[in-house]
Regions:
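Soluble FAD-dependent oxygen oxidases
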Residues: 2-499
Length: 499
């Protein structure tokens, strides 16, 4: 069977997945005659009730309005400091639902957001007064172990991918937190514990099905709609809503050595210096993230390495020995573990269920100036946890030329992230201000940023961040989204006036 035919059969089989039934609106008089909303340019409009009802009837999934019982839960994202209220939430069950949403949004020029795993720290997976296209019901996977391919629907979480492939002795790069949405991670880049072996998640993308701004469902790969396929690999959600991903899989032992090594904080600068020197020459099977953390409630500051070694197990001791020699070990919980278990190990610790603020940038060298800035300015606080950590890059990620995909940052050896989190419901302003001050001191050591972590960058910064790929991305935007319907992202603004 040809790959394209298998892709189509996978779409059919995944579309047949059943979902829980839902109760429609109890009574017509619970819906206002007109629904207040906003356009992409933030202009207020009113949508006729009859149009909303027709839209609702066209969907296989649910359409939620603010008065509906499930609306308050459906509007939430993982960063609890984001408190937005869409005018409509469409919970899509298939590609046809997504097409209906895009056509409806295009007709009314609605502000449009797309949500998968709700991990967008900047809140771009939701909106105030617009249409939220919620892909969370659109979950399913189909594996072709012979061809080493997996087909993943647009609302799926990374854990579904790992669960389907690892028992078959196959794997691919899929982040570090299992409840991350596959869409946002893939379209922006896709770092992960296997990235140094297999490349970014987007480097393993072989094809997509995508609903573009004209409501058309298009197939794109290296041969068909090849420019669109190039653009979605790093251009984020600028060109449409991906409803199906096809990924390359690789042979992989589902057993790895992973966990955490915690060191004495008195050696934190030496440990970061070690990381800067050792990580760039470490085997590609070794991935480790150094974390410096100032916990809330007066607990001592911490420094630790989160580790994953996915190479031959009989070589693990030799490969990991330098990490044990890097500093005074206070706690060691490295063990031979199922990779799937390791992928889920940080789910409960992930701060994205609290209020938070993150900033990030790419690093080529871990200099003494950077180390001093990170450590000396990390501030303890009674209610705020603050941290800085490195996502290790290099290896297969950096072997790809900068213009092979739209993701240009192949020079980076690490993605540095700083951030803070605090309890939901407390005043966010002082915590955000501290986070911004901390980042301003760190930013001068970075070069470019990961668009998945983009928070408040200016349009000029976003444009510049695509480096030599920007002009090509603008041409693709002009072709597939000339009205900038998909603007809640690291936005590539079209340069033509749509007819």
């Amino acid at each position: 069977m040809k790959r394209r035919e298998f892709f189509k059969s996978a779409v059919v089989s995944l579309a047949a997945v059943s979902y829980p039934s839902w109760k429609g609106y109890a009574d017509d008089n619970t819906i206002p005659i007109e629904i207040p909303a906003v356009t992409g340019s933030r202009q207020p409009i009113a949508i006729e009730r009859i149009a909303v009802e027709e839209f609702r009837k066209s969907l296989n999934g649910r359409l939620l309005l603010p008065e509906d019982d499930d609306y308050q839960v459906a509007r939430l994202v993982r960063n609890r400091s984001i408190d937005k209220r869409p005018a409509l939430i469409a919970q899509c069950r298939n590609s046809e639902d997504v097409q209906a949403c895009v056509n409806f949004a295009h007709h009314y020029q609605l502000l449009t957001a797309v949500k998968c795993g709700a991990h967008s720290v900047s809140g771009k997976g939701t909106c105030d007064g617009g249409l939220l296209i919620d892909l969370s019901p659109l979950q399913g996977v189909s594996v072709n172990p012979t061809k080493r391919r997996i087909f993943v629907t647009g609302g799926s979480l990374l854990g579904r991918l790992d669960e389907a492939t690892l028992p078959l002795g196959l794997g691919t790069t899929a982040g570090t937190v299992s409840h991350t949405g596959v869409g946002g991670l893939t379209l922006g880049g896709g770092f992960g514990r296997l990235g140094r072996r297999f490349g970014l998640t987007l480097d393993n993308l072989k094809s997509v099905e995508i609903v573009t701004a004209d409501g058309q469902l298009r197939y794109a790969d290296a041969e068909e709609n090849s420019e669109l396929f190039w653009g979605v690999r790093g251009g984020g959600g600028n060109f449409g809503v991906v409803t199906m991903f096809e990924f390359q899989l690789h042979p992989m032992n589902p057993k790895v050595v992973g966990g955490r090594i915690t060191y004495s904080f008195s050696q934190v600068k030496d440990l970061l210096r070690f990381y800067g020197e050792h990580s760039v020459k470490a085997p590609v099977e070794l991935y480790y993230d150094p974390v410096i953390f100032a916990p809330p409630m007066g607990f001592d500051k911490m420094v630790y390495f989160d580790v994953c070694y996915s190479g031959p197990l009989d070589q693990a001791e030799k490969v990991l020995k330098p990490l044990y020699s890097a500093g005074k070990v206070l706690k060691d919980n490295l063990e031979t573990i199922d990779y799937m278990t390791l992928q889920k190990s940080g789910d409960d610790d992930d701060p994205r269920g609290a209020s938070q603020y993150l900033k990030g940038g790419f690093i080529t060298d871990v200099t003494s100036g950077l180390i001093d800035t990170l450590v000396d300015n990390l501030e303890a606080h009674p209610t705020r946890g603050s941290m800085a950590f490195f996502q290790q890059s290099g290896g297969a990620i950096n072997e790809v030329p900068a213009d092979t995909t739209a993701f240009p940052h192949r020079y980076a050896n690490s993605n540095l992230i700083t951030g803070s989190f605090w309890p939901y419901g407390v005043d966010t302003a002082p915590h955000i201000e501290w986070s911004r001050r901390y980042w301003r001191k760190v930013d001068k050591f970075t070069k470019g940023f990961y668009t998945v972590d983009e928070f408040s960058e200016s349009q000029q910064q976003v444009n510049k961040n695509f480096l030599g790929n920007y002009d090509r991305l603008v041409k693709i935007k002009n072709q597939y989204d000339p009205t900038n319907l998909f603007r809640l992202n690291a936005n590539i603004k079209p340069t033509i006036t749509a007819g």
